Amino acid sequence: MAKKVFIKTFGCQMNEYDSDKMADVLHAAQGYEPTQNVEEADLILFNTCSVREKAQEKVFSDLGRVKHLKARGVRIGVGGCVASQEGAEIIRRAPYVDVVFGPQTLHRLPELLQQRERLDQPQIDISFPEIEKFDHLPAASVQGASAFVSIMEGCSKYCSYCVVPYTRGEEVSRPLDDVLVEVAGLADQGVKEVTLLGQNVNAYRGRMGSTAQRADLALLLDYVAGIPGVERIRYTTSHPNEFTPRLIEAYARLPKLANHLHLPVQHGSDRILMAMKRGYTAMEYKSTVRKLRAIRPDLALSSDFIVGFPGETQDDFDKLMRLIAEVHFDNSFSFVFSPRPGTPAAGLPDDTPHEVKLRRLQQLQGVIDTHIRSISASRVGTVQRILVEGASRRDAAELMGRTECNRVVNFAGPPHLVGQMVELTITEARAYTLRGQYCAQESPQATMAA
């Protein structure tokens, strides 16, 4: 009987990708099969996120909940950014943990587990071997018509509030050929949509063959768009400073490039942006957005926002709200500032009461929600091309998929549509999703906006 592994993922899409790779590595090396039931697992892994304190502390809370399973010989591992940041401190706080491994060493997980058995003591590997991880990963397993592909690791921007450069290391890009081989392999297995991943994905500079030349993200997108079977391309997460004219032009020449972009601005006050060490002004951000929407007028934008950064005044917050009103974001991920140990911002003086920060966050989220509802309502009556991902979460008898602009659509349709690109007429706008009607016959050209 095959051993089973339970993996709980915290945080970003890069962590989701890494969790899939953990499962692939364990299956290839030791025959583990994934399970969603922690009670039947032989191995429990937490793939962690340290971007915010709440997520970090939840890891230790979850560890406590599975501690009792050690009585029947279950092994427990902690990976991801908390593992990289805390290292041996995890073993000190939770001595029943068997292995601790960083984002760059997940490929060594089978070896670490073997060493745990042989040496009868916890194992820790949070080193940063440059790109070695990708050289030792098995072929990707396909679980649908969409897939993540990591094209680079780490970040070299060192924003004053962010732990990513310390937990995932400096930027390292995968060679161009390696990425293309992985995408082509996924397409051969039926994947129609790929999302290219990186902490700072548009800083990609992949080696081209044996030459000294480097491919940027714009060139990589050209190559990926030419791979047979790939019908839609996404990428995340972008940094405004790396948005080159070539990348902007890609939206004009590549119809396969999805009509959605996650481009975190973080704030709308130049003073706060400078304190964050973001490297751009609000005006420069809006200029990039204008250039993009000159090519794709209905381009859907989403962003991260940090409210209550140390020293944020009411005037600073008002500037943030003005930027939001001007840009009209389609979605957001907004949070109150969470000081992370070891970052410059953690030591900045902060005299803004927490209740004021919470009130500002609620105000921001209320405005964004109004934008989302307005955009959704404008889609009613349009025809949208979606990738059908599977059963609807609302009703298992129905299907769901995503539009070009990453909006979820639920609809009634035959099961054989799963994994296909289909056209739907949008019939209803709900809070954060759409409802559509399947157009079984050939329909008019689908609009790009949704």
UniProtKB/Swiss-Prot annotation:
Residues of the MTTase N-terminal domain: 3-118
SMART domains: Elp3 (SM00729)
Catalytic activity: N(6)-dimethylallyladenosine(37) in tRNA + (sulfur carrier)-SH + AH2 + 2 S-adenosyl-L-methionine = 2-methylsulfanyl-N(6)-dimethylallyladenosine(37) in tRNA + (sulfur carrier)-H + 5'-deoxyadenosine + L-methionine + A + S-adenosyl-L-homocysteine + 2 H(+)
Pfam families in UniProt: Radical_SAM, TRAM, UPF0004
Known cofactor(s): [4Fe-4S] cluster
Enzyme class label: transferase
Source species, domain of life: Bacteria
Function of the molecule: Catalyzes the methylthiolation of N6-(dimethylallyl)adenosine (i(6)A), leading to the formation of 2-methylthio-N6-(dimethylallyl)adenosine (ms(2)i(6)A) at position 37 in tRNAs that read codons beginning with uridine.
Name of this chain's protein: tRNA-2-methylthio-N(6)-dimethylallyladenosine synthase
UniProt organism field: Verminephrobacter eiseniae (strain EF01-2)
